């Protein structure tokens, strides 16, 4: 509703379905000007990227935002230029197997927080895990509200800039 308040001529397609390889056929990519990937599964992300590339539809993909605390660490880059992000590393390897070498992504240069066996939150370093965060008996949430939302805003900005050719 909000999009139509801003632009009554906008076409908004809402799908109440997860995009997975087995549901991909329910989406007609010829209707899209741009694809925004915020899928949490690698198989879904790979299928979406492969299909968008095959249909020559521009796509931007969000890499890992879970277990991050710094919303200012996001960057926009080609997947081939990413570092630090474990999801980007997996995506880069799997995309290469599919003959895809370029994908516009939003990724974080922050190392993800990990849990030690004691339940301590720490950061992975070359030497191992450091205890620089806090102690908790509860598992760390997968993400903080303020981190993935920033990735979404960055992706939205990139889509607008690409579609309007604003640079």
Spans of features found by a protein language model:
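Adenine nucleotide-associated cytosolic modules
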Residues: 1-167
């Amino acid at each position: 509703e909000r999009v139509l308040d801003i632009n009554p001529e906008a076409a908004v397609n809402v799908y109440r379905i997860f995009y997975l390889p087995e549901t991909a056929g329910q989406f007609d990519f010829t209707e899209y000007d741009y694809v925004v990937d915020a899928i949490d599964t690698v198989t879904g992300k790979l299928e979406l990227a492969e299909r968008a590339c095959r249909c020559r539809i521009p796509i931007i993909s969000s890499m890992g935002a879970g277990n991050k605390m710094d919303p200012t660490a996001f960057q926009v880059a080609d997947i081939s230029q990413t570092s630090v992000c474990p999801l980007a590393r997996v995506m880069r390897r799997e995309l290469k197997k599919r003959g895809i070498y370029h994908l516009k992504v939003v990724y974080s240069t922050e190392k993800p927080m990990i849990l030690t066996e004691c339940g301590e939150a720490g950061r992975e370093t070359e030497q191992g895990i450091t205890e620089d965060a806090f102690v908790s008996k509860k598992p760390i949430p997968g993400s903080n509200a303020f981190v993935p939302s920033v990735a979404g805003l960055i992706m939205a900005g990139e889509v607008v800039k690409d579609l309007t050719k604003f640079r």
